[in-house]
Amino acid sequence: MSIQRLGYLGFEVADVRSWRTFATTRLGMMEASASETEATFRIDSRAWRLSVSRGPADDYLFAGFEVDSEQGLQEVKESLQAHGVTVKVEGGELIAKRGVLGLISCTDPFGNRVEIYYGATELFERPFASPTGVSGFQTGDQGLGHYVLSVADVDAALAFYTKALGFQLADVIDWTIGDGLSVTLYFLYCNGRHHSFAFAKLPGSKRLHHFMLQANGMDDVGLAYDKFDAERAVVMSLGRHTNDHMISFYGATPSGFAVEYGWGAREVTRHWSVVRYDRISIWGHKFQAPA
């Protein structure tokens, strides 16, 4: 048994208030809860999908991967333990905070916290309503979206996420960033979404490179682009990726890592073949210096 989807993400941020404004007015998320020290946000019928907690890191804090049942959670726990990973069965306080029925946690080879759960809270009686009028986000069986981490050892990352957690490799991109710097990106999937997680040995001090939201319509992306562009907060221009074919742009967040906002990604198929690419984009995705 492997995990089924990316369910939620948590970030440690220096300025919760800025994130509350950013998530609602730039990304079109719906605020679910908020205080001076933390906030959560919705993008669909789930009680929350994104959490920000006050702290100095301005970086990745945790990811939550979903399974469909208690049995599935037990099977993932056994798989992790079989691969030498220490697993913690979380208690009632954190279970209540996450709004799930069962929860385990561990760390990947680089100390990144990973949570696996089942039984998330649905709020069909309180429909998602974007404050900016976003038509909706592609979630459901594909989960939240994706995120990309910088790791020190790609072989160790590949072993942990594919063998212990059950991800499958979608493809690889050898990306020449510039000035002779080249990195290899690994893209992993666990459902129809082309990738829910990716990693590479990237330059820079942050663990989180970016996270991605997939909107239901291209106009949603264009309207979001205009908001970022007006604030000179576009990091990479509109473009279309070679591997998942998503049309997207990248914007700056209040914490220094990026958010990818896209539409139109293709899905993995039953007879998917792993391939490699020499470029990240068919067109576009030109670097821009945010203000």
UniProtKB/Swiss-Prot annotation:
Disulfide bonds: none annotated. Residues 5-119, 143-264 form the VOC domain. InterPro entries: DiOHbiphenyl_dOase, Glyas_Bleomycin-R_OHBP_Dase, Glyas_Fos-R_dOase_dom, VOC, Xdiol_ring_cleave_dOase_1/2. GO terms for molecular function: dioxygenase activity; ferrous iron binding. CDD domains: BphC1-RGP6_C_like, BphC1-RGP6_N_like. The keyword Metal-binding applies. Fe cation binds at H146, H210, E260. Signal peptide: none annotated. Pathway: Xenobiotic degradation; toluene degradation. GO terms for biological process: toluene catabolic process. Homooctamer. Belongs to the extradiol ring-cleavage dioxygenase family. This is 3-methylcatechol 2,3-dioxygenase. It comes from Pseudomonas putida (strain ATCC 700007 / DSM 6899 / JCM 31910 / BCRC 17059 / LMG 24140 / F1).
